[in-house]
């Protein structure tokens, strides 16, 4: 609403494992029951887990949590998306991005490591997801990952999807929530290395998961 950016530590969420745990805990703590999902008081949370961008198989998905736009009870729901948005968020140094309030005009959120800006999106408002991705990639750089909504989200269709990395979707009506906030897209680039406490344990976990994945498809 006032186009400000703040940073909060994630230490209070250590007991809530992964992006799903962090996202749902934030929603539970900060959005009262009965909130209109399309109101400025609702929030939308993009969150990643501790293994994101470490190379562990299946650890690259991103949780997007908000209030349901397509059920009458408006409970907290979460969508899960692949693509590169999760790795970009993690390598930029963030565990979660929480968006609240609503803009009076179309905007997009640009995250370049620690540099966070809210920028005008008039030039791409009304465009589809692919055209928006191409336009913002040309403007900001092709090494940014773009997660965007299209006209369905802008017009608050309850089943509208967010699309990131050109063709990876996230449903649960999250795009309608972004549309209600006049938030056209997240544009994210991360360049920071990811460190783990026990690299050998992570490597062993990756090997184990790869064996299990290959074995489960060896008919």
Which stretches of residues belong to each language-model region?
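Intrinsically disordered, low-complexity segments enriched in small residues
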Residues: 1-80, 84-219
């Amino acid at each position: 609403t006032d186009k400000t950016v703040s940073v909060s530590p994630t230490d209070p969420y250590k007991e809530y494992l992964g992006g799903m745990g962090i996202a749902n805990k934030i929603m539970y703590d900060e959005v009262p029951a009965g909130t209109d999902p399309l109101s400025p008081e609702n929030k939308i949370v993009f969150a990643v887990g501790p293994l994101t961008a470490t190379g562990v198989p299946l650890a690259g998905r991103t949780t997007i949590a908000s209030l349901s736009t397509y059920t009458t009870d408006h409970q907290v729901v979460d969508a899960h998306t692949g693509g590169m948005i999760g790795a970009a968020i993690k390598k930029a140094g963030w565990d979660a991005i929480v968006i609240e309030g609503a803009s009076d005009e179309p905007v997009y959120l640009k995250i370049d490591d620690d540099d966070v800006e809210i920028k005008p999106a008039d030039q791409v408002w009304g465009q589809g997801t692919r055209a928006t991705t191409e336009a913002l990639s040309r403007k900001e750089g092709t090494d940014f990952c773009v997660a965007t909504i299209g006209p369905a989200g802008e017009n608050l269709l309850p089943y509208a999807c967010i699309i990131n990395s050109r063709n990876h979707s996230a449903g649960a009506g999250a795009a309608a929530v972004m549309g209600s906030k006049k938030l056209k897209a997240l544009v994210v680039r991360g360049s920071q290395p990811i460190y783990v406490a026990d690299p050998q344990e992570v490597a062993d976990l990756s090997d184990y998961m790869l064996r299990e994945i290959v074995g489960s498809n060896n008919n």
